[in-house]
């Protein structure tokens, strides 16, 4: 959000693709890539070095990633567990509220009302763009 510009390409009906959700971020010094069909890996490609593949469940991942991992590395984990992480975060927030505990530094790791409002604004902007012939439309910041 420091004035960096990007492009979002999204399609729910790409011919020949079954699901293939992927996120790729490209910068001047390298890129990050994640593919839902291979969800346990994050690929880091530096412009001047061989690519690095980070796999979930290993000791080199951060504390947040370790906390969201339920099975040892090389064992499958994925879609259903992602929802379990959201529910666990919500349950922790409720338990903390009941016990009078403060939220952890950085807040809780689950979507809140602001995330929901931003998601709805995105959907409305996508519909508006579609009705305008796939033209760029202003995305309201919430």
PLM region descriptions:
Residues 17, 33, 119:
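Short catalytic/ligand-binding loop motif for oxyanion handling, primarily in non-cytosolic enzymes
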Residues 117-130:
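C-terminal hydrophobic helical "lid"/dimerization subdomain
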Residues 1-20, 24, 114:
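Rossmann-like dinucleotide-binding domain that binds NAD(P)(H)
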Residues 9, 35-36, 139-140:
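Short linear motifs in exposed loops
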Residues 1-2, 29-110, 114:
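C-terminal glycine/acidic-rich active-site capping loop/insertion
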Residues 128-142:
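C-terminal capping/lid region of NAD(P)-dependent oxidoreductase domains
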